[in-house]
Curated annotation (Swiss-Prot):
<keyword id="KW-0346">Stress response</keyword>
<dbReference type="InterPro" id="IPR036388">
    <property type="entry name" value="WH-like_DNA-bd_sf"/>
</dbReference>
<dbReference type="InterPro" id="IPR021153">
    <property type="entry name" value="HrcA_C"/>
</dbReference>
<dbReference type="InterPro" id="IPR036390">
    <property type="entry name" value="WH_DNA-bd_sf"/>
</dbReference>
<dbReference type="InterPro" id="IPR029016">
    <property type="entry name" value="GAF-like_dom_sf"/>
</dbReference>
<keyword id="KW-0678">Repressor</keyword>
<comment type="function">
    <text>Negative regulator of class I heat shock genes (grpE-dnaK-dnaJ and groELS operons). Prevents heat-shock induction of these operons.</text>
</comment>
<dbReference type="Pfam" id="PF01628">
    <property type="entry name" value="HrcA"/>
</dbReference>
<keyword id="KW-0805">Transcription regulation</keyword>
<protein>
    <recommendedName>
        <fullName>Heat-inducible transcription repressor HrcA</fullName>
    </recommendedName>
</protein>
<dbReference type="InterPro" id="IPR023120">
    <property type="entry name" value="WHTH_transcript_rep_HrcA_IDD"/>
</dbReference>
<dbReference type="InterPro" id="IPR002571">
    <property type="entry name" value="HrcA"/>
</dbReference>
<comment type="similarity">
    <text>Belongs to the HrcA family.</text>
</comment>
<dbReference type="GO" id="GO:0045892">
    <property type="term" value="P:negative regulation of DNA-templated transcription"/>
</dbReference>
<dbReference type="GO" id="GO:0003677">
    <property type="term" value="F:DNA binding"/>
</dbReference>
<keyword id="KW-0804">Transcription</keyword>
Length: 338
């Protein structure tokens, strides 16, 4: 159990190192207003903290830096919530204020904004469409030969595609088709749509649409949408701006992993509750052993729909990143309920 004095010194060391990226010595601590102990006392307490494994020496300096154990203790016991600047809160809320909530568009923009606000790498795993349910479908004619089919799901995903309208299908046929589709398919899971259409809906449409065969061929292409989730990155190269990663050899495997993207699907797909912080070697990938990954999920009720994560050095601004993720996931979840 750490004493109050040790807790204060440990927190001050970590806060200072997060801001400066420079090892922290007793002289630096002695200049802090909140540290009122003698230099000898500070040195003794630092020696005890080092012996306990919370801080460690570096090869190039007499100062100390936090260990993974130190960061873990800091995150679990010493971290205080950080109030975000009002301008950032407004910027984030504006992103989610669109009248039509397009989940994939928001996911992509969220990754970009988060990377800019943190100068770390942001990763957003979009909703998996196979678990979405159809909310409604629209077919909007552009001219006599083409139309735009708009598919909206219960999670706010909007899929639009341009389709060719056969000459034998007129506007009244299109209108009848849309009415039947919305009446019969609203609430049906996206992964079941294709079978539902060709096992049940085609029979219903036969009684409504004059040019039945042409209309069915058009529908076949309309509902072929990708069902797997998409992953969006913001600030892929941001890690290179961190002092820890100026050695390109050290960071090469991490950059390769970020560039390939696929490995992050497995990392972000896991079920979790609330904010999760993985520090250094707590990450399963060896490429991330000098990094911290903070992730949070957005959901509707009990259903987890996607994940937002920030990847940065272990010397990460944990409090700020957690506050940002809490705001983003809250806004994302509220947007999906619209």
């Amino acid at each position: 159990m750490l004493t109050e004095r040790q807790l204060l010194i440990l927190q001050t060391i970590i806060d200072d190192f997060i801001g400066s990226a420079q090892p922290v010595g007793s002289r630096t601590l002695a200049k802090k207003d909140e540290i009122t102990f003698s230099s000898a006392t500070i040195r003794n307490e630092m020696a005890d903290l080092e012996e306990l494994g919370f801080i460690e020496k570096t090869h190039s300096s007499s100062g100390r830096v936090p260990s993974e154990k130190g960061y873990r203790f800091y995150v679990d016991h010493l971290l205080a919530p950080q109030n975000l600047p009002n301008a950032e809160i407004v910027q984030i809320k504006d992103l989610f204020a669109e009248r039509i909530f397009e989940a994939e568009k928001i996911a992509q923009q969220s990754a970009q904004i988060l990377s800019e606000l943190t100068n770390y790498t942001a990763i957003v795993l979009g909703p998996k469409l196979s678990t979405n349910k159809l909310k409604n479908v629209q077919i909007v004619p552009l001219d006599r030969q083409t139309a735009v089919a708009i598919i909206v799901t219960d999670t706010g995903h909007v899929q639009s595609k341009t389709i060719t309208v056969p000459e034998s299908v007129d506007l009244s046929d299109l209108e009848k088709m849309v009415n039947v589709l919305n009446e019969k398919l609203s609430g049906v899971p996206m992964e079941e749509l294709h079978n539902k259409i060709f096992k049940e809906i085609v029979t219903v449409l036969r009684g409504y649409v004059h040019n039945y065969d042409s209309a069915i061929r058009m529908l076949d292409g309309t509902f072929q949408v990708p069902l797997s989730e998409k992953i969006y990155f913001g600030g892929k190269a941001n890690m290179l701006s961190q002092p820890e990663f100026h050695d390109i050899q050290k960071v090469r495997s991490l950059l390769t992993m970020i560039d390939n993207e696929a490995e992050f699907y497995d990392i972000l797909r896991h079920k979790q509750v609330g904010i999760q912080v993985k520090i250094g070697r707590e990450n399963t990938s060896t490429a991330m052993e000098d990094c911290s990954l903070i992730s949070a999920t957005y959901s509707i009720g009990e259903e987890q729909l996607g994940t937002i994560a920030i990847l940065g050095p272990t010397r990460m601004q944990y409090s700020r990143v957690i506050s940002l993720l809490q705001l983003f996931t809250r806004q994302f979840t509220d947007g999906l309920k619209k």
